[in-house]
């Protein structure tokens, strides 16, 4: 039987570092980090993620501002909120919950986030830095994937890695981060032929497609590492893309949902807000 990769345990050390940083600043009467999180509409995964952000931020003494907009807002409505946050010196990080409702122009809206406050690497400039290897904020979910794999103390170099999903939020950036670790990376998507065959050759399988319990044991190589990035509402519960019960006996390591990638992602987001505050003061 495979082992569970506990995102909460991996996050603990980082949380302690954040807590110490915030406490020192409070003690010296210095500004503490503040994150503003924008949610448009009522996407289940986004609501869950925002709630997690708020809970962790509060536990670490980081200020958290929730901005919830109706689903029928316009591009300009969202952009106006972003501009206010760009101009607010007390806000170090802006988090826009994706996906946005389909009638909104996601690229146009994202472009308006200040790169100095883009703590989840959403803007073109931030992503350009990522792909060119320049210093900048790493996208939190992809960084969480890499951090969890590294927590297993395995050498990623030369490993066959399949990333299932090609979104700009997870699939593409996580593939780039894995390439930076010298993995051999294959990206699969809805048009990939013989998907089971491709996935079943992976030493490491990263799944980010938003289809609850889509991946079962037939997609898994014996003793593979399986990282489930999915968070969907399914039968009243938050569920991943991997059918955990069917995969755990075949894989060597699997991340649960909840308690896996998402548990660490939120912590890395807050860590980025601390880094943004340091950059602002420098």
Swiss-Prot record:
UniProt binding sites for NADP(+): 165-167, 190, 231
Enzyme Commission number(s) of this protein: 1.5.1.5, 3.5.4.9
Record-level GO cellular component terms: cytosol
A single GO molecular function term of this UniProt record: methenyltetrahydrofolate cyclohydrolase activity
Superkingdom of origin: Bacteria
Keywords, sorted A to Z: Amino-acid biosynthesis, Histidine biosynthesis, Hydrolase, Methionine biosynthesis, Multifunctional enzyme, NADP, One-carbon metabolism, Oxidoreductase, Purine biosynthesis
Gene3D superfamilies recorded: Leucine Dehydrogenase, chain A, domain 1, NAD(P)-binding Rossmann-like Domain
NCBIfam families: PRK14172.1
Function: Catalyzes the oxidation of 5,10-methylenetetrahydrofolate to 5,10-methenyltetrahydrofolate and then the hydrolysis of 5,10-methenyltetrahydrofolate to 10-formyltetrahydrofolate.
Similarity comment: family membership: Belongs to the tetrahydrofolate dehydrogenase/cyclohydrolase family.
Subunit structure: Homodimer.
Full protein name: Bifunctional protein FolD
Species, as recorded: Clostridium botulinum (strain Eklund 17B / Type B)
Gene: folD
